[in-house]
């Protein structure tokens, strides 16, 4: 398991005695952080089991120990950094387990590990990377299947912030108003309640913002497009 750092003083003391550090910055409100912490602990355990291991894995709650976050210009979580004598040599930003495993393997090669140890560690890292990739592919497949069902849940589906009775953003509120004024019956999904859907739907439909309107499973667009269609009298023609 990786060591948890609670104060800047703890970090400074460790920095004096350890040349090679892998540090993960996380936050308890960040779901991607939870996923990456599990991978980070797995990589730390693997390194600990290696003879002549010189890597030390540390976990830092970014907002709690902000001195360290600021020192290495950490602006989002999860972020993992690789330090050689306190100097930043590499970083992995976001929930990217395969990239973290790859960079950890590459970083370990700079730590004077014996050739046999390198081979064993590389093999184990590759196995971890392959497993992570398979898990990611399966997870993405399941998410896309879920998204396809959601966009077809109703002939007209609005993915929005909040719900039609209580929209949580101005654009969602305006979109609901336009649909109601045109007599649309529609289902809705509150993307604030599901981070996986919120992030996944952007990639699924290649549309970066919300709200998103779907008719018969096909993306119509966001508020600007809905507004233009309404003003041109074309929105009503899309009603199923």
Swiss-Prot record:
Gene Ontology cellular-component terms listed: cytosol; nucleus
Gene Ontology MF terms in the entry: iron-sulfur cluster binding; metal ion binding
GO biological process, one term: intracellular iron ion homeostasis
Localization of this protein: Cytoplasm
Domain Thioredoxin: 1-125
Binding site for [2Fe-2S] cluster: 169
Domain of life: Eukaryota
Principal location: cytoplasm
Disulfide feature: none
Domain Glutaredoxin span(s) in chain numbering: 144-240
The entry's keywords: Cytoplasm, Iron, Iron-sulfur, Metal-binding
InterPro entries for this protein: Glutaredoxin, GRX_PICOT-like, Monothiol_GRX-rel, Thioredoxin-like_sf, Thioredoxin_domain
Domains (record comment): The thioredoxin domain lacks the two redox-active cysteines. This strongly suggests that it lacks thioredoxin activity.
Function: Crucial regulator of cellular iron homeostasis. May play a role in regulating the function of the thioredoxin system. Does not possess any thyoredoxin activity since it lacks the conserved motif that is essential for catalytic activity.
Protein name as annotated: Glutaredoxin-3 homolog
Organism (species): Dictyostelium discoideum (Social amoeba)
Gene: glrx3
